[in-house]
Amino acid sequence: MSVQTMGNVDPHDAAACLAQLKSCAELGCDVFRLTVPDLEAAKVLGEVRRGSPIPIVADIHFDYRCALAALDAGADALRLNPGNIGGAENVRAVARAAKAKGVPIRVGVNGGSLEKDLAAAVAAGTLTRPQALVRSALDHVKLLEDEGFRDVVVSAKASNVPETLATYRLLAEATDCPLHLGVTEAGTLLPGTVRNSVAVGILLAEGIGDTIRVSLTDRPEREVKVGLEILRSLGLRAPGPAVTSCPTCGRTKVDLMRIAAEVEDALERQYRLNLSNDNRTIEQSSNRTILNRTFPRVAVMGCVVNGPGEAAGADVALCGGDGEFLLYVRGKLVGKVAESEAAGKVVEHALSL
């Protein structure tokens, strides 16, 4: 199960694109998408690909020549709508070139870009939007299959949770093609995270989906973090650092929000460092199995109500008092630590296990 994101810097700036890609890759991103609006951007994609540690998908609209140029530049996959790159000859040219290079094509349709006849059917009530999205996607898949191209991934994204669920359930019944999941135009960080987590999480729990992208009006790094957390929460990705923390209440007499964030950030940085080292080791060998590291479970609790119970189940735990914490290691009390030292101490013990 792969996590994807898409660059949002100038596609003609190779250095900026590569920097953003590497930043996402360091967080655990598996696939990075770049828009290719013109032939010059296709050349830039080639520069970026030569320096990229992960596969790149070229996002194509309207001009089939951009797809051909992206393939020549080394794109690992294409994302396009065969219906908007011209006539059958253009589709045939792209399909032949992709097949010759062994490059898959993702057929991606969105609720906001339905064909006029399908949009009219939705407006008239003769089709639901999910039905129209599925019909659009399958019609585009057929254009490729008619040219003998079978290496296809499909996405059909709506901008709300109920339509996303209905669309992908219909798609899963209608095709055996791998499905790329996501809620399109999901919004800013908070609502977008919630909408994607609910929709993508439900579909994955039902066994639907092969790749995901969490679309946010935010930096792509945040898309990656949310996507990985969705997979981890469902047991579909090796777990990273697990920090349990309470929501605080009037009993809390320590700055728990700050300390929990510091602990989480420090453990996440170490996790990314280990992941980077593991990937470098794998690249130097023929073994492509990702090394799974088990990170300790850490609890950061604000008071004695749930603190001792959480401490018993955690590898390392803090239980807040009045300006200080009790520190537990594998359920045993090892002492008190001042609030100013608490985050550092729990991270130190966690990394030593």
Predicted regions and their residues:
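Catalytic alpha/beta core domains of metabolic enzymes, predominantly
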Residues: 110, 118-274, 299
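Alpha-helix-loop-beta-strand connector modules within alpha/beta enzyme cores
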Residues: 39-60, 93-105, 168-179, 263-268
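Conserved, mostly hydrophobic/aromatic
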Residues: 3, 59, 107, 154, ...
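Hydrophobic or amphipathic alpha-helical targeting/insertion segments
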Residues: 65-106
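N-terminal amphipathic alpha-helix/helix-capping segment at the start of soluble metabolic enzymes
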Residues: 1-6, 99, 265, 275
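Intrinsically disordered, low-complexity proline-rich regions
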Residues: 280-289, 293-294
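Active-site mouth loops of central-metabolism enzymes
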Residues: 1-16, 35-37, 54-62, 83, ...
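Glycine-rich, proline-tolerant flexible connector loops at the mouths of alpha/beta enzymes
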Residues: 6-14, 25-51, 79-87, 152-161
